[in-house]
């Protein structure tokens, strides 16, 4: 197999909300890439040795004195460079052109008239009826380039942006004022393919099969004949991590499945059946429900509940790891967005989002090496790897489930009675979404237990029982979300089933809050 890291694109992040999309598109094309803060050093770029460089968009203005700049070495490295939005503007400024703020800001759909067909725009045209090639694109900018650097030509214009694209074919420098990475730019993926494959000359060998082969080889090289321990939750990341490690080291992998009593209906049995029986993994099930529930008694605050659940998990996992006296490595399902969010910026100006729980090493008392076979992969890539390894699609494409599980879906204090009722109600909700074809139309759906009683009528009698709320949302990025407009007859069917089949629930409500102002989870 060819080295899948041999050809690679470096993406410098200037803070755009779309920057990770650039990386995902390049990976989709079949080429490895990494995303770094814009203020990297020349030495770091030299060591990475990119085949091409992409400068992302960003929220700053190139007209400000302290605005971010690409390292000068970017333009001296002898590799093709593509500037996107802010990336085009800083390229123009740094190479001797001019930018200025515009009275006509462009946000949303625009049509670019192609003035010259350079290598970047080869074979691209979204308007076949026009004598002049045009591209349907997505704009999001205030500043614009007003004077080209020496050696550049205008390759695209819009009515309000005379220099919407530019190129210097001799040095293979290209700039586009629009965002090719978003799906609204119709030929965006084709444009990026032109840059990455045709201009940079990258081989498209970043495929699930090659990634698996590479990961297995690297695991073997890292751990050799040593034994590895992994906390297996049944979620996508830990499941794919488990199967990669199992393929590489077989029975030297010890999986610990901590059943905390906060899982979905029959989930513990399903995990054991899938990974123990079907895939033959060496897996230990720790039934810790009583321990978790005891620790959570009297705790009502959501953050305090999260912390306690995390603490008890670490304690239980640590006890199990000490029983495996020959284990030398801990495996984690860290994925690439975790690594990006935790990357430190040299100047402190780059936009670093948060510190992530999977990144930054282990507790001091755990004297184990760290194995992270997914740390180069985006979530969609992890799912593709899982599919190639034999995991069922319905498991890989399941809606997100929070780390604390039902601990944040039972409001207030957590009790076994509440969890048992919630499990049954939620299973009915999800089953009916599947049966009606709505499960994959919504981004996330779940049930919340409300610790209040409401009067109900059953037969000839009145009784007070608990209330649950159904929640279903539609979202692209989980940063904002709309409540899903499920059909009334479907909601009615779900409500009737829950009230009739789950003894202890007398009322079902539907949450019609968007994000913002509400969050997706209730706690």
UniProtKB/Swiss-Prot annotation:
CDD domains recorded for this chain?
A: GATase1_GMP_Synthase, GMP_synthase_C
Q: Which residues bind ATP?
A: 233-239
Q: Could you name the Gene Ontology cellular component terms for this entry? A: cytosol
Q: Where is the active site?
A: 85, 179, 181
Q: Which GO terms fall under molecular function for this chain's record?
A: ATP binding; GMP synthase activity
Q: Which UniProt keywords apply?
A: ATP-binding, Glutamine amidotransferase, GMP biosynthesis, Ligase, Nucleotide-binding, Purine biosynthesis
The record places domain Glutamine amidotransferase type-1 at 8-205
The catalytic activity of this protein is classed by the Enzyme Commission as 6.3.5.2
Q: Which reaction does it catalyse?
A: XMP + L-glutamine + ATP + H2O = GMP + L-glutamate + AMP + diphosphate + 2 H(+)
Any one Pfam family match given in the protein's UniProt record, by short name: GATase
Q: In which pathway does it act?
A: Purine metabolism; GMP biosynthesis; GMP from XMP (L-Gln route): step 1/1
Report the InterPro entries cross-referenced here: Class_I_gatase-like, GATASE, GMP_synth_C, GMP_synth_GATase, GMP_synthase, GMPS_ATP_PPase_dom, NAD/GMP_synthase, Rossmann-like_a/b/a_fold
Which HAMAP family does this chain map to?
Answer: GMP_synthase
Question: Tell me, what does this protein do in biology?
Answer: Catalyzes the synthesis of GMP from XMP.
Q: Which PANTHER family match?
A: GMP SYNTHASE [GLUTAMINE-HYDROLYZING], GMP SYNTHASE-RELATED
| Binding partners and assembly | Homodimer.
What name is this protein filed under?
Answer: GMP synthase [glutamine-hydrolyzing]
In its UniProt entry, the species of origin is given as Actinobacillus succinogenes (strain ATCC 55618 / DSM 22257 / CCUG 43843 / 130Z)
The organism's taxonomic lineage, starting at the top: Bacteria, Pseudomonadati, Pseudomonadota, Gammaproteobacteria, Pasteurellales
């Amino acid at each position: 197999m060819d080295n899948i890291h041999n050809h690679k694109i470096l993406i410098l992040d200037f803070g755009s909300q779309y920057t990770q999309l650039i990386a995902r598109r390049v990976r989709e094309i079949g080429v490895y890439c990494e995303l770094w803060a814009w203020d990297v050093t020349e030495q770091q770029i030299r060591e990475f040795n990119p085949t091409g460089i992409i400068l992302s968009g960003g929220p700053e203005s190139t007209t400000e004195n302290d605005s971010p700049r690409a390292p000068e070495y970017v333009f001296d490295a002898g590799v093709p460079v593509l500037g996107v939005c802010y990336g085009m503007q800083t390229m123009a400024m740094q190479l001797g052109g001019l930018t200025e703020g515009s009275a006509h800001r462009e946000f949303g759909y625009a049509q670019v008239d192609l003035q010259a067909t350079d290598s970047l725009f080869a074979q691209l045209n979204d308007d076949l009826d026009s004598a002049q090639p045009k591209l349907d694109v997505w704009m999001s900018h205030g500043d614009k380039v007003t004077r080209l650097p020496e050696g550049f030509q205008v390759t695209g214009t819009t009515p309000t942006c005379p220099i919407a694209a530019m190129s210097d074919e001799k040095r293979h420098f290209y700039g586009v004022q629009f965002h090719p990475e978003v799906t609204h730019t119709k030929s965006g993926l084709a444009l990026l393919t032109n840059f990455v494959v045709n201009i940079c000359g990258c081989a498209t060998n970043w495929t699930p099969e090659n990634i698996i082969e590479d990961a297995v080889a690297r695991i073997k090289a890292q751990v050799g004949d040593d034994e590895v321990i992994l906390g297996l939750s049944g979620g996508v990341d830990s499941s794919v991590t488990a199967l990669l490690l199992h393929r590489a080291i077989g029975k030297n992998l010890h999986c610990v499945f901590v059943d905390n009593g906060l899982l979905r209906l029959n989930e513990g049995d399903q995990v054991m059946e899938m990974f123990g029986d079907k895939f033959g993994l060496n897996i230990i099930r720790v039934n810790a429900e009583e321990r978790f529930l005891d620790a959570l008694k009297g705790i009502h605050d959501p953050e305090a509940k999260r912390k306690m659940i995390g603490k008890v998990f670490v304690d239980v996992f640590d006890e199990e790891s000490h029983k495996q006296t020959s284990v030398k490595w801990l495996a984690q399902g860290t994925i690439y967005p975790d690594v990006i969010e935790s990357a430190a910026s040299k100047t402190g100006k780059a936009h670093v989002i948060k510190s992530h729980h999977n990144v930054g090493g282990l507790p001091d008392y755990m004297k184990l090496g760290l194995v992270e076979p997914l740390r180069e992969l985006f979530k969609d890539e992890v799912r593709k790897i899982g599919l190639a390894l034999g995991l069922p699609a319905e498991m890989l494409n399941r809606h997100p489930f929070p780390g604390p599980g039902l601990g944040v879906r039972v409001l207030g204090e957590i009790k076994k009675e509440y969890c048992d009722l919630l499990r049954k109600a939620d299973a009915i909700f999800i089953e009916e979404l599947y049966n009606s074809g709505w499960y994959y139309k919504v981004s996330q759906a779940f049930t919340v237990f409300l610790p209040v009683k409401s009067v109900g009528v059953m037969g000839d009698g009145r009784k007070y029982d608990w209330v649950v709320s159904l929640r279903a949302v539609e979202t692209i990025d989980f940063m904002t979300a709309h409540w899903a407009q499920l059909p009334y007859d479907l909601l009615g069917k779900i409500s009737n089933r829950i009230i009739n089949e789950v003894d202890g629930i007398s009322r079902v409500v539907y949450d019609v809050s968007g994000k913002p102002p509400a969050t997706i989870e209730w706690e």
